[in-house]
Amino acid sequence: MINGAHIIVYSKDAEADKAFIKNVLKFKYVDVHEGWLIFKLPPSEVAVHPSDDNDRHDFYLMTDDLDAEMAGLKRAGAVCEDVSQQAWGRVTRIKLPGGGTLGLYEPRHERP
């Protein structure tokens, strides 16, 4: 029986991104070996979208109030892209210190 999911975020500055997830997003974590942090995620869901690119996967965090979440992130020093309106929700991307981005959205769809 599958009982969870493990997501890997690749980074050009893993230490900075780990500090961001720990200190700005405030995710709980365990140090499994010499600074290798594994973060606890909120409940999750998986969606399958049609695409010609079979090896692409996106990772989004979800919130019930995108404006409030973005305001809190900005107060903590995070930079968020402009919000876009999609059929499935309001979407932004959080800029990570290592140069990558992390999706964040307020869903319009029913959640399982």
Which residue ranges define each predicted feature?
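N-terminal beta-strand motif that seeds the catalytic metal site of vicinal oxygen chelate
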Residues: 1-18, 45, 57-59, 108-112
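Vicinal oxygen chelate
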Residues: 4-12, 40, 51-112
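Conserved active-site tyrosine of GNAT-family acetyltransferases
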Residues: 17-22, 73, 99
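Short secondary-structure junctions
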Residues: 25-32, 78-83
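Conserved short beta-strand elements that form part of the metal-binding/catalytic scaffold
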Residues: 27-57, 61, 101-108
